[in-house]
């Protein structure tokens, strides 16, 4: 391997491992990694907001909700990949 590739690989490893070493267990109890959804939901419920509508169907568990989210992301990625491939193929065939 070229020296440049080895240095780049070492840089990637250092950048990947450094946050794990620096934040190993720190901040979990303080809520640093709570997420935007949790904080936004708490901010909305503090004002006494009542929803206008009820969901038509609510998933029975968090795992199914995660599955549906992953399925939605996969379908979106397939559509985007198809569109990029279509336009790239159309551009190559016109040349």
UniProtKB/Swiss-Prot annotation:
<keyword id="KW-0813">Transport</keyword>
<dbReference type="GO" id="GO:0005886">
    <property type="term" value="C:plasma membrane"/>
</dbReference>
<dbReference type="GO" id="GO:0015087">
    <property type="term" value="F:cobalt ion transmembrane transporter activity"/>
</dbReference>
<keyword id="KW-0472">Membrane</keyword>
<comment type="similarity">
    <text>Belongs to the CbiN family.</text>
</comment>
<comment type="pathway">
    <text>Cofactor biosynthesis; adenosylcobalamin biosynthesis.</text>
</comment>
<keyword id="KW-1003">Cell membrane</keyword>
<keyword id="KW-0171">Cobalt transport</keyword>
<keyword id="KW-1133">Transmembrane helix</keyword>
<comment type="subunit">
    <text>Forms an energy-coupling factor (ECF) transporter complex composed of an ATP-binding protein (A component, CbiO), a transmembrane protein (T component, CbiQ) and 2 possible substrate-capture proteins (S components, CbiM and CbiN) of unknown stoichimetry.</text>
</comment>
<feature type="transmembrane region" description="Helical">
    <location>
        <begin position="5"/>
        <end position="25"/>
    </location>
</feature>
<keyword id="KW-0170">Cobalt</keyword>
<keyword id="KW-0406">Ion transport</keyword>
<keyword id="KW-0812">Transmembrane</keyword>
<keyword id="KW-0169">Cobalamin biosynthesis</keyword>
<dbReference type="GO" id="GO:0009236">
    <property type="term" value="P:cobalamin biosynthetic process"/>
</dbReference>
<dbReference type="Pfam" id="PF02553">
    <property type="entry name" value="CbiN"/>
</dbReference>
<protein>
    <recommendedName>
        <fullName>Cobalt transport protein CbiN</fullName>
    </recommendedName>
</protein>
<comment type="function">
    <text>Part of the energy-coupling factor (ECF) transporter complex CbiMNOQ involved in cobalt import.</text>
</comment>
<feature type="transmembrane region" description="Helical">
    <location>
        <begin position="67"/>
        <end position="87"/>
    </location>
</feature>
<dbReference type="InterPro" id="IPR003705">
    <property type="entry name" value="CbiN"/>
</dbReference>
């Amino acid at each position: 391997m070229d020296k440049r590739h080895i240095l780049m690989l070492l840089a990637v490893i250092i950048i990947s491992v450094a946050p794990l070493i620096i934040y190993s267990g720190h901040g979990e109890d303080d809520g640093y990694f709570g997420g935007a959804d949790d904080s936004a939901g708490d901010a909305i419920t503090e004002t006494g907001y009542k929803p206008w509508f009820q969901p038509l169907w609510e998933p029975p568990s968090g795992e199914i909700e995660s599955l549906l989210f992953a399925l939605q992301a996969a379908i979106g990625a397939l559509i985007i990949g198809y569109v990029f491939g279509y336009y790239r193929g159309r551009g190559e065939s016109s040349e």
